[in-house]
Amino acid sequence: MAGNELSGWESSDPTLYDGALWAITVDENTEYQRFRAVATMIVDHCANRLIVLDDTTHDRCAALISHMPHVISTAMINELVANPNRNIAAALAAGSWRDMTRVALTDPNRTRAMVEEDAANVEALLRNMANRLTLMANVLHGMTAQQGAPTAGDDKEMARFFVQGQPFREYKALTKEPDFAEHCETVELAIPETGWQQMLLESARRGEHIVRFDGYRQAMAQVRSSV
């Protein structure tokens, strides 16, 4: 999983895949030897990490961390363009706006195609996001009605909104440590002959990334994305 907001040959980057995580999608008909050949290329020849997913899990996660954010980011720049104070707002925009709208700067046709390909998952996430934002808007409306003093219920909802994501903040703080990879827990995976697809999917759900193979059905993984 790698990329940026740019497109075209002139935007190619030889370091794009450095340290990248690969997601290999398999199903019940995937032959282990074929999976193993691709996995070996990734960990041995590319020196990268990998996780194993099924198509459904891959598409849902891609919608969550890529496709839905592209829509949200695009909605933000649409909101600015439609605002009568857009020129002032654009002049005042700094780091927060830049970071949250970066992916909206990519080719809109590419973004549209990406979103349309995963429409059902993106729709569900956007409705979840709309519910979260509506809840916050309702809390703020209550504060306005109370002249800035939230009710006990509103205060509780406000606190919950801003602390719910704390596990992700802590996870990101850990990944910024220069020796993060060295301190990740290492686990050995014994890959069975049957049911290996589901076993490796559950490994990915625990945040384990395969970093090498010590045998045909023996892999070593690091716990790299446990939120």
Walk through the language-model features, giving the residues of each:
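Short linear motifs at secondary-structure transitions and domain/linker junctions
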Residues: M1-G3, A47-V52, I77, I88-A91, ...
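Active-site-proximal catalytic alpha-helix in oxidoreductases
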Residues: Y32-C46, T57-N109, E123-N131
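Rossmann-fold dinucleotide-binding core
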Residues: M1-R49, L53, D59-A62
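Glycine-rich loops and low-complexity Gly/Arg-rich segments
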Residues: A20-A23, N48-R49, A75-N78, N128-M129, ...
